[in-house]
C-alpha cells in the first residue's frame, strides 16, 4: 500500500490504517490516497474487522495535499492526467471527492485519531470518518476545499465566519462545536482511540452498520452529497481564477498562501 501501513488488533476486530509519510507531515500524494483507498477496501471486506481507525504517523495527522514532493512530481510525470482544466477537474474529483465519499460510506464505524496539524486535505479525510478523537495539541484548518463538508461539520454561520477569518482551530474549540468527539492528552491519543474502538466493536456489526447507514442517508436526503459535488464546481472555478502553484514552480515544496496567512495570524 506504499505510503499506508495496515495492521489489525490481536483479535482482528480493529483495523489500523496509518498515513506513513511523517517526513512530509503525511502530505497526501496521489499514491498515498490510492493506498488509503486500498486499505479501507481491505478493512471493509474483512469480516473480522468491526471498527476502522485512521491515524497519522509522527507528530502530525496530515498537512494536507502534496504540493510537490519529489515522489509526487515523479508520479505526475510517470502517470500524467490529461492536460488542461479537464485533467485537473478529473484528478480533483476522483482523488478528493469520489474517493472521500466512498470512505464516508464504508459500512463499518470509522474513527480518526488526530494529532498536530490537520490542514485542508487532512480535514477532508478526518471529516469522512464517523468519529474524531483529537490530541490536545491538534490544530485544524478548514477551507473551501474539494470535498466541502465544512458547512455540514460546523453549521453554515460558523463556517462562514471561520473561513473568512482563516484561523487555526484547536481541538477544544471543535469539541464544543461537535466536530471532535473527545480531546485527550497527546500521550493518551492511541490508547483512548483504541478504547473507544474496542467499546464500539462490542456492538453487533449489523446493528452498527444500519445505524451508520441511517444517519448517512438522513444527511443525503438533506442534500449532503449534492452539496459536496456542487461545491466542487465552485472550488474548480476558484482554482482556475488563480492557481496557487504557478506553472514552472511545481518542484518547489511550499505551503498554500492561505496556510501561511493562518500560521502568521
Model region roles, listed by residue range:
Residues 17, 21, 35-36, 54, ...:
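Terminal peptide-recognition signature
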